UniProtKB/Swiss-Prot annotation:
Gene: yoqK
Organism: Bacillus subtilis (strain 168)
Protein name: SPbeta prophage-derived uncharacterized protein YoqK
């Protein structure tokens, strides 16, 4: 058996209408579950300016072995 790729992080991408919405969601839902901001940028979605945030969290051994 040969290991091709080892993932140590889980990633999620969210699109928000503004920074206030992003901050509220992060503080109330994601941060308590161990998520952290990996990257953020401004872009266009459906012809509107949006905030894109990529979050990541470290995978635990329990997650890796029991998926």
């Amino acid at each position: 058996m040969k290991l091709i790729e080892e993932r140590t992080y889980e990633e999620r991408l969210y699109i928000y209408s503004d920074d206030i919405e992003a901050r509220k969601h992060f503080v109330s839902e994601l941060k308590p579950k161990g998520w952290m901001v990996d990257n953020c940028w401004v872009g266009i979605d459906l012809n509107q300016i949006k905030q894109f945030y990529r979050f990541k969290r470290e995978l635990t051994d329990d997650y890796v072995f029991n998926r």
